[in-house]
Amino acid sequence: MEKIFSSSDFDFFTPGLSELELPLAGEIACGFPSPADDFLQESLDVNKLLVRHPDATFYAVARGTSLAPLVQPGSILVIDRSLEWSSDLLACCFIDGEFTAKWIEKSGDKIRLIPLNPDFPTLEYSPEEAEIYIWGIVTSIINNNVRLSRLQ
């Protein structure tokens, strides 16, 4: 990955699109336990899984907690700039010179930016109040900071 830009909320990178196929061990039960597979089924290339439009895809490393617990500081957001935005998508937005990621919702002539963390307010803007640019749509979130104890 090559760093291309930093803001107060994100570091942006271009994806490294080298192929790396890893063994896919089949499915794992997250409900009731199931018998384990006795063999590996196939392989998986993470870039092919996460990047649908290579020329329009960027990674951003999150800072801040407005999307916690889904997105934590250090989470990697996969952002596709080729996708059209619509309400109820997680978007990377550029507002008054800063990037932020929030769920977006159009309400009349206003745009609402909705955090997941209840400690943060929903932001609502009309075209007169702020210049908002939907920079891209978050298509995947990579959390490499999984805690080994249960979430509380």
Task: Put a short name on every predicted segment.
Residues 74-76, 89:
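Structural motif
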